[in-house]
Structure formats: C-alpha cells, structure tokens
C-alpha cells in the first residue's frame, strides 16, 4: 500500500510512522526549571546518534502554542537526565505521561525516588537501570510543532547486576529488562526475545555466501 504523506493530516502521518518505525526506545527525561522544580516525562522519538562524541537526540513537541515543560527546562538549564525504562517501571512511566498542569512534580506524584547525578545538577530516577547524564548541544526547531533536542552524554549509570565487565564496558542488556514503544495508543514491547548475528568481513562473506550467487 502506497501512502502519500503530502495528502495526510498530521494525525494520520503520526499514526503511520509510529505504527511502523518500531520498536522505539523510551527516553524518560528528568529536567528542572529555573527554580529547581523537577519534571519527568517519557519520549519515544529518541535514539543515540554517535559514539564519539556520544550524542543522543530526543524529539519534543510543543503544547498549547508553546514549549512543553521538558523543552523549556532543557533550554533554560542546558542539562537533563535520560532514564531508560524497565518493565517494572512501565506503569510509573505511563503515569508521568499524564498531561499535568505546568509546575507539577511528576516524580513526587508517582512516588519515584531520585539520586544525585555526578556531572549535572538534575537528579536521576533511582530505580531506573540506566541513566544518561546529558548536556545540551542545540535544539533544532522544525516547523511549528517539532523540536529535536541534541545532547552530549557526559556520564552513564548502569545497574551493577547488569555490568558483566566494567573495564571493557560489557553490559548484559537482557538483565536491564527494558521496554520499547510500539504503535499508538498504548503499544509497548519487551526486549526478552533477542537473537544474534555476527557481522562477516568480505572474505568470510565471499567464502560462505558469495559462491552461492
């Protein structure tokens, strides 16, 4: 089936993309305003876009003609923390997606404890198995409703039980039990069903695959 995006309204194009670009990791962003009040919100338009320097991007929309709390906080303080979401915290994460009035502390409302970060002033969610301390590089505004937050990761926290070899940065990803976003509304997936494939160099590929062509 062919879809011409130019003929679709914004809701239809959103549904089409979020139902097909899956699974998407979830950035559970903790930020703070200029008075130190905390905000927590999940975003699934998120991924890492470089390892050196380590860069992540988060897509944040606007609300009511202005920036969402997360975007306003990030632009004001130029720092935030991305927490990744395990299945055990899925319900709490979903609660923080509620459209609370401005100034409400979602962490306090949901009873989520925090721990201090090392390099940024914004705390991390204590129960999250992975937290990325981030500093803002730039915000790219696209049209009137889309913003891409580009940030550098300055520190990473990983739950001890998921670290196989700290010196080599080997992580047992399965032990993180992370979830991902699927289609809207309300679609999620677990990361338990995984498989591995070793990447071949050209000589190996030629020997095992090329001769069959």
Model-assigned labels for residue ranges:
Residues 1-213:
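Basic, polyanion-binding surface patches
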């Amino acid at each position: 089936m062919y879809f011409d995006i130019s003929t679709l309204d914004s809701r239809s194009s959103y549904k089409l993309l979020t139902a097909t670009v899956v699974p998407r990791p979830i950035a559970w962003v903790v930020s703070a305003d200029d008075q130190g009040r905390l905000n927590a919100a999940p975003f699934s338009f998120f991924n890492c876009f470089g390892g050196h320097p380590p860069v992540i991007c988060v897509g944040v929309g606007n609300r009511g003609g202005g920036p969402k709390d997360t975007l306003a906080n990030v632009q004001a303080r130029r720092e935030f923390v991305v927490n990744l979401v395990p299945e055990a915290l899925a319900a709490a994460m979903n609660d923080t997606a509620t459209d609370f009035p401005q100034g409400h502390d979602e962490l306090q409302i949901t009873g989520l404890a925090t721990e201090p970060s090392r390099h940024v002033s914004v705390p991390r969610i204590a129960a999250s198995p992975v937290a990325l301390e981030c500093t803002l590089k730039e915000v790219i505004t696209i049209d009137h409703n889309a913003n891409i937050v580009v940030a550098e990761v300055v520190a990473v926290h990983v739950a001890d039980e998921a670290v196989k070899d700290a010196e080599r940065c080997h992580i047992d990803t399965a032990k993180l039990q992370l979830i991902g976003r699927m289609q809207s509304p309300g679609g999620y997936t677990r990361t338990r069903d995984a498989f591995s494939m070793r990447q071949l160099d050209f000589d190996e590929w030629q020997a095992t695959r090329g001769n069959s062509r």
